[in-house]
Amino acid sequence: MSTHDPISDLITRIRNAQMRAKSKVSTPGSKMRANVLEVLKNEGYIRGYASVDHASGRSELEIELKYFDGEPVIREIERVSKPGRRVYASVKNLPRVNNGLGISVLSTPKGIMADHEARDANVGGEVLFTVF
């Protein structure tokens, strides 16, 4: 099955799995999804992820979700930039999520990174989604 928006698909799979208190969820593999998951892992929102190759040649990403006292670590995850309405931000205009308690994930010329990394690298880009 093809999706027109792989980032929204990834976010929805994570959100749905956490609502059902699943420990793992899988998603079709791609470099962009792996880079997004690397940012979420580095920021402490997921335990980790692994790439699983199938005999048919397709790969999947197996995501280990993270919980604290039985509650999901990710309270809220929202798509900002969509295929029909792209949202770009310069370094000066990067959004702060809940006064810095959450993060924005951006696609920049230097790769996919969290908002604080983009400020340090002095780059702006497309605001993919926010996590709190």
Curated annotation (Swiss-Prot):
Keyword annotations from UniProtKB, A to Z: Ribonucleoprotein, Ribosomal protein, RNA-binding, rRNA-binding
Superkingdom of this protein's organism: Bacteria
Gene3D superfamilies cross-referenced by the UniProt entry: 3.30.1370.30, 3.30.1490.10
Swiss-Prot/TrEMBL GO biological process terms: translation
One GO CC annotation: ribosome
Listed PANTHER family: 40S RIBOSOMAL PROTEIN S15A
Family: Belongs to the universal ribosomal protein uS8 family.
Oligomer status and interactors: Part of the 30S ribosomal subunit. Contacts proteins S5 and S12.
Role this protein plays: One of the primary rRNA binding proteins, it binds directly to 16S rRNA central domain where it helps coordinate assembly of the platform of the 30S subunit.
Record's protein name: Small ribosomal subunit protein uS8
Originating gene: rpsH
